[in-house]
A protein has these predicted regions:
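Short aromatic/hydrophobic "clamp" motif used to bind/position activated sugar donors
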Residues: 87
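A conserved acidic beta->alpha catalytic loop
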Residues: 25, 32, 40-50, 67
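Donor-binding/catalytic cores of nucleotide-activated saccharide
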Residues: 71, 92-194, 201-217
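Acidic helix N-cap motif at the loop->helix transition within catalytic regions
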Residues: 18-20, 45-54, 60, 95, ...
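Glycine-rich, basic loop-to-helix element that forms the pyrophosphate-binding segment
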Residues: 66-82, 103
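Catalytic core of nucleotide-sugar-dependent glycosyltransferases
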Residues: 199-206, 212-240, 251-283
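Membrane-interface aromatic/basic loop that binds lipid-linked glycans or pyrophosphate carriers
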Residues: 261-319
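Short, well-formed alpha-helical segments that are part of the catalytic scaffolds
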Residues: 14-28
Length: 319
């Protein structure tokens, strides 16, 4: 059997409502030499049976069923089974835009890049706005990731040469930001990365999705991932240490914003620790948004606890 050119990996957990549209968005692509790996991660809503039905209707759709192990394990299962020269990741509640595969494949071939990425859209709102096609070489991709370039947030919305993935896998012990860390590890291999000025991915906001879940201690992975990135930069890219410190500082700031929304005193010691870290590292802050500047001011001028108190009052009043 001839190997497909592109392998599309879709982790699916209780996504029965969204899978038909997701699969149809792949089937509607201009480029038709693909395989679609549906990884049923122990679904309990009938998603597994639907994967089998979709496979029976289209031989390019390949279902795989496993016990629930999380999105990273599901994506890794897809990587182990893909046969394509190129790989894409697509979430089960999202869709590829028309022409996605053709645009990304053309960009890779025209530039000799290893990773191609494009814009995403949520309803009528378009994210990720490169003004025109751009190419990163060497450390530029690592620098872009540390600087929060919007095309480095996620594993989806991209086409990868299978060779650049190699033996890199999603970390199963990371539950938040696992896909940005996966992409960061690929960028540390210093591949050529091309960004295209085209909307190629539709991101759908699902209230029960992993990225929309209520606060839990898995969010501690936000600064854990930042620490992992910092260690890699310290070891392999010392010239980017300033950018890495700024990245880590922003992760601490982000974590404090999440903690401010948590009632009670359960995380008070962690809040104190992070406030000390932010104050000590504020000299490395690189201004990016007015909102970020204001939040840093709050955190470094003794205003965090008044902000927290006011937030909790407003939250209770709104119930």
């Amino acid at each position: 059997m001839e190997a497909p050119l592109i392998s599309v990996i879709v982790p699916a957990y209780n996504a029965k409502k969204y899978l038909p549209a997701c699969v149809a968005s792949v089937q509607r692509q201009e480029h038709q030499n693909w395989e679609l790996l549906l990884i049923d991660d122990g679904s309990t809503d009938g998603s597994g049976a639907l994967c089998d039905e979709l496979a029976a209707a289209d031989g390019r759709v390949k279902p795989h069923h496993q016990q629930n192990a999380g999105v990273s394990a599901a994506r890794n299962a897809g990587i182990e089974r893909d046969r394509g020269e190129y790989v894409m990741f697509l979430d089960a509640d999202d869709e590829l835009m028309p022409g996605c595969m053709t645009s990304l494949l053309d960009a890779l071939r025209q530039t000799g890049a290893d990773i191609a990425a494009g814009k995403s859209t949520q309803d009528s709102f378009a994210w990720n706005h490169p003004q025109s096609r751009f190419v990163w070489n060497g450390e530029e991709g690592v620098s872009g990731s540390l600087g929060d370039h919007p095309l480095t947030y996620s594993a989806w919305g991209k086409l990868y040469r299978r060779a650049v993935i190699g033996d890199t896998r999603f970390r199963r012990d990371i539950r938040i930001n696992e896909d940005s860390f996966f992409l960061f590890c690929l960028l540390c291999k210093q591949p050529r990365f091309v960004g295209v000025d085209q909307v190629i991915y539709r991101y759908n906001v699902v209230p029960t999705g992993a990225s929309r879940a209520a606060f839990s201690e898995k969010y501690f992975d936000i600064f854990r991932v930042a620490d992992l990135k910092y260690e890699i930069i310290q070891r392999d890219f010392p010239a980017l240490l300033g950018a890495a410190q700024n990245m880590r500082l922003k992760a601490w700031m982000n974590m404090l914003e999440l903690l401010a929304a948590c009632p009670g005193r359960k995380y008070r010691d962690l809040e104190k620790e992070l406030l000390c870290k932010v104050r000590a590292a504020r000299g490395s802050y690189v201004s990016a948004t007015r909102r970020g500047d204001l939040w840093l001011f709050v955190l470094t001028h003794g205003l965090y606890y008044p902000y927290r108190f006011a937030y909790q009052l407003i939250k209770r009043a709104g119930k």
